[in-house]
């Protein structure tokens, strides 16, 4: 894998959290591991490094022909643990409180299983074009919101891993605009949340277009 594709996967995973995304609560902050983290920039950096370190393992799980591995709840939780386990004690643990996004905590196991079973069916029967399958998988998992935080980053990476497992290039998730200043970043966040909200009414067209932009 080229350095540029590797970088796109990392940035895509840690990329823009949408406006209206799940805030970090005091309960979450109690689980912060690095003692030197004092600012959002510090947190972004340690999370970025953690995700980068998790990528080699994640990519091995998603080698071409191994898509079935991704449709397992245990994989989703293990991926989140590896992405954030150096930063948060609760990494890889199920969300226990209600949030502004996601199903109630007691419904997470069933909703997650249903989302992954549907994705497996789409894959095995090639129900949709490949980009739409990946976008739908991301959208469904975000809708479950299984973790206290990091759901968007984890589920974007899962979508990219699925694409890799079938020999398709990963989504770019508008990474070309992430270094264009604060206003451009706000525009990216607005476009991302708008695309999530538009699905499935628009047949996921906006989400696929954003993911490939």
Locate the predicted segments by residue:
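FIC/Doc superfamily catalytic core
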Residues: 1-213
């Amino acid at each position: 894998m080229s350095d540029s594709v590797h970088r796109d996967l990392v940035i895509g995973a840690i990329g823009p959290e949408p406006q209206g995304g799940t805030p970090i609560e005091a309960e979450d902050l109690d689980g912060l591991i690095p003692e030197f983290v004092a600012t959002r920039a510090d947190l972004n950096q340690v999370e970025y490094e953690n995700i980068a370190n998790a990528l080699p393992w994640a990519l091995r799980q998603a080698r071409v022909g191994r898509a079935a591995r991704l449709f397992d709840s245990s994989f989703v939780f293990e991926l989140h643990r590896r992405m954030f386990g150096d930063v948060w004690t609760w990494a890889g643990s199920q969300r226990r409180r209600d949030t502004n996004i996601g199903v109630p905590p007691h419904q997470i196991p069933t909703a997650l299983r249903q989302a992954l079973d549907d994705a497996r069916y789409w894959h095995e029967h090639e129900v949709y074009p490949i980009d739409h399958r990946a976008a739908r998988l991301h959208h469904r998992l975000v809708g479950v919101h299984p973790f206290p935080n990091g759901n968007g980053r984890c589920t974007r990476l899962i979508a990219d891993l699925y694409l890799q497992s079938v020999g398709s290039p990963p989504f770019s998730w508008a990474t070309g605009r992430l270094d264009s200043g604060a206003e451009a970043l706000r525009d990216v966040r607005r476009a991302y949340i708008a695309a999530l909200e538009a699905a499935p009414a628009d047949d996921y067209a906006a989400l696929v277009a954003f993911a490939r932009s």
